[in-house]
């Protein structure tokens, strides 16, 4: 039997996910296959070492939908235990997606760093502008106080002159 015809696909259930953590993977296999063929197929397709294979036939079950009755199809299931240190990546699309996610995350962090740098520069410029404005306001206040003092002195001088001329 051809290696590609032996394994129909993985069986992904809650129980199979729990078994994956201990190195046991479940596959739907051809009804005509046996343990040794399944072992060779898994080792060839996934490039791993298999410790042991359990195979059993899942019987058909009666299902009802409304008034009609039917049966699920029976199939052969293989539980494949891998040697320690080997794993099978059943979701090949995840790893490139994870890389894309990490790239976008790094790009986002770079963008955030640039934005933070620009914010810091703008805050520094705003601080400089605020200091310049404060200096100008202080200078204007000095000039106004000087002009007020000069005007007061002029008024005092005028009043003194008027008093002196009146005497």
Curated annotation (Swiss-Prot):
Disulfide bond is among the record's keywords: no
Stretches with biased composition (Basic and acidic residues): 97-112, 137-157
Domain of life: Bacteria
GO MF annotations, alphabetized: rRNA binding; structural constituent of ribosome
Biased composition, class Polar residues, residue ranges: 158-167
Region (Disordered): 91-112, 137-167
Pfam families per UniProt: Ribosomal_L23
One GO BP: translation
One cellular component (GO) term of this entry: ribonucleoprotein complex
Function: One of the early assembly proteins it binds 23S rRNA. One of the proteins that surrounds the polypeptide exit tunnel on the outside of the ribosome. Forms the main docking site for trigger factor binding to the ribosome.
Protein family according to the UniProt entry: Belongs to the universal ribosomal protein uL23 family.
Assembly notes: Part of the 50S ribosomal subunit. Contacts protein L29, and trigger factor when it is bound to the ribosome.
Name by which UniProt lists this protein: Large ribosomal subunit protein uL23
Organism: Mesomycoplasma hyopneumoniae (strain 7448)
């Amino acid at each position: 039997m051809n290696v590609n015809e032996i394994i129909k696909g993985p069986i992904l259930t809650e129980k199979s996910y729990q078994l994956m953590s201990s190195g046991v993977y479940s596959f739907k296999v051809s009804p005509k296959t046996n343990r040794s063929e399944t072992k060779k197929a898994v080792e060839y397709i996934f490039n791993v070492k298999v410790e042991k294979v359990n195979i059993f036939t899942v019987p058909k079950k009666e299902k009802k939908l409304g008034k009609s009755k039917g049966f699920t199809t029976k199939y052969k299931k293989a539980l494949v235990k891998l040697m320690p240190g080997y794993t099978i990546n059943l979701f090949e699309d995840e790893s490139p997606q994870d890389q894309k996610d990490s790239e976008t995350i790094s790009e986002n962090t770079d963008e955030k760093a640039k934005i933070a740098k620009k914010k810091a520069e703008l805050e520094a410029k705003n601080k400089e502008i605020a200091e310049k404005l404060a200096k100008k306001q202080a200078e204007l206040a000095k000039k106004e106080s000087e002009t007020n003092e000069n005007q007061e002195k002029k008024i005092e001088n005028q009043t003194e002159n008027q008093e002196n001329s009146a005497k």
